[in-house]
């Protein structure tokens, strides 16, 4: 949802603020070339707004997408390469490749390095009203708005995560809940939400708060999750074919709403370190 008209202008695009955060960059001419835009300017807009959506630009071929993203920085290479196709698999082994929801998480948790940016392009979008929105949570905003007492508790918290590696990630890790953003220096939350009732229960993630009694685990995690989904903290992007979306993977957590099984949802994603 757009809440204000242009807040910044460029000869190549206009910028409109989204609510509760984010910015929409609309090309001044249809089928413009995203490769002609200033990457430095796009980086600054992403740091400022947490995420940017670019609309009215021509899609990139798979190899072209990977080559372009290399101009942003080193790419995280997985067993499938650099470009992940986010589509429904006929016989999925992981919930990412179903039409169920994807709980909030950060990317790169089980990798050697955490990406700075998530870079998406939308090849096919679900029909309006059929679900499949990508969700983003501004964890900087959460930490700025919770009570000092809650912030202090979270700053002392470590959480362990464990999942079997049947897709391109997996293992067992322990991470501090609150970390500093490596670019902006702001405090952020690093949390991965376990599967829930709207999830397809394939390859689940097991979450445990370190040094917390068993009877306090669920209340602690549930309170944290409630903050993630508050309207003032959560942005749902309804995809349109041809959309690009660039997200700050350090400041944001992201997930997905479930969608109809016959929806033709096809995104491509690249991790930029």
From Swiss-Prot:
Textual note on the cofactor: Binds 1 Fe(2+) per subunit.
Catalytic activity entry: (2S)-3-(1H-indol-3-yl)-2-isocyanopropanoate + 2-oxoglutarate + O2 + H(+) = 3-[(Z)-2-isocyanoethenyl]-1H-indole + succinate + 2 CO2 + H2O
Cysteines joined through disulfide linkages: none
Swiss-Prot/TrEMBL cofactor(s): Fe(2+)
Known EC number: 1.14.20.11
Domain of life from the UniProt record: Bacteria
A Pfam family per the record: TauD
Enzyme class: oxidoreductase
Binding site for Fe cation: 105, 107, 254
Single Gene Ontology MF annotation: oxidoreductase activity
Keywords: Iron, Metal-binding, Oxidoreductase
Family: Belongs to the TfdA dioxygenase family.
Function: Involved in the biosynthesis of ambiguines, a family of hapalindole-type alkaloids. Responsible for the synthesis of Z-3-(2-isocyanoethen)-indole, a biosynthetic precursor to all ambiguines.
The protein's name: 3-((Z)-2-isocyanoethenyl)-1H-indole synthase
Organism: Fischerella ambigua (strain UTEX 1903)
Organism classification: Bacteria, Bacillati, Cyanobacteriota, Cyanophyceae, Nostocales
Gene name as annotated: ambI3
